[in-house]
From Swiss-Prot:
Function description: NDH shuttles electrons from NAD(P)H:plastoquinone, via FMN and iron-sulfur (Fe-S) centers, to quinones in the photosynthetic chain and possibly in a chloroplast respiratory chain. The immediate electron acceptor for the enzyme in this species is believed to be plastoquinone. Couples the redox reaction to proton translocation, and thus conserves the redox energy in a proton gradient.
Protein name (database record): NAD(P)H-quinone oxidoreductase subunit I, chloroplastic
Similarity section: Belongs to the complex I 23 kDa subunit family.
SUPFAM superfamilies named in the record: 4Fe-4S ferredoxins
GO CC terms in record: chloroplast thylakoid membrane
Molecular function as annotated in GO: 4 iron, 4 sulfur cluster binding; iron ion binding; NADH dehydrogenase (ubiquinone) activity; quinone binding
Length: 181
């Protein structure tokens, strides 16, 4: 009888310890910050090296087609005509289909005139896939940064900014300064 009572009490203590361990894991997860955001109202601020939509400056382009040659899928479409009077190419149109683009950044890296650059824009959804084919006019528009949008609360520090320090200043604006340690 006493041996049975000892076994029962040992099993009860072991069970309580296992339940306590599980409860401690639950409490540990409750103290963590949220890993989700309320998307339309809160937006993540991408890192400095984020590869978003490509920005194109028509006036800088010399129609060398390096971007087409280095693209793994030959995506940019460059239309140009040879100007005999100036003895050089003149760009007529430039377009990129973001429905096909893999955002590798080769075109930006190898462009000799730096007329291509990556923006922080990641909202490229459309109801029709043909709307994702951006011509040189659409590529030239710079997106409105989410950090400056008064209707959106930017979210910092969910893995996009490594050493961000969030400080509250006048009003309800959130400013991030990066420490250089």
């Amino acid at each position: 009888m006493i041996k049975g009572l000892q076994n029962y009490s040992q099993q009860a203590l072991r069970t309580a310890r296992y339940i306590g361990q599980g409860f401690m894991v639950t409490l540990d997860h409750m103290n963590r910050t949220a890993s989700t955001i309320q998307y339309p109202y809160e937006k993540l601020i991408p890192s400095e090296r984020f590869r978003g939509r490509i920005h194109f400056e028509f006036d800088k382009c010399i129609a060398c087609e390096v971007c087409v040659r280095v693209c793994p899928i030959n995506l940019p479409v460059v239309d140009w005509e040879f100007q005999k009077s100036m003895k050089k190419k003149q760009l007529k149109s430039y377009s990129i289909d973001f429905g096909v683009c893999i955002f590798c950044g080769n075109c930006v890296e190898y462009c000799p005139t730096n007329c291509l650059s990556m923006t922080e824009e990641y909202e490229l959804s459309a109801y029709d896939r043909h709307e994702l084919n951006y011509d040189h006019v659409a590529l030239g528009r710079l997106p409105f940064p989410a950090a400056k949008d008064p209707m959106v609360q930017p979210v910092y520090g969910i893995g996009y900014l490594e050493k961000g320090i969030v400080e509250r200043t006048k009003g309800s604006k959130t400013i991030t300064t990066l420490s250089t340690n």
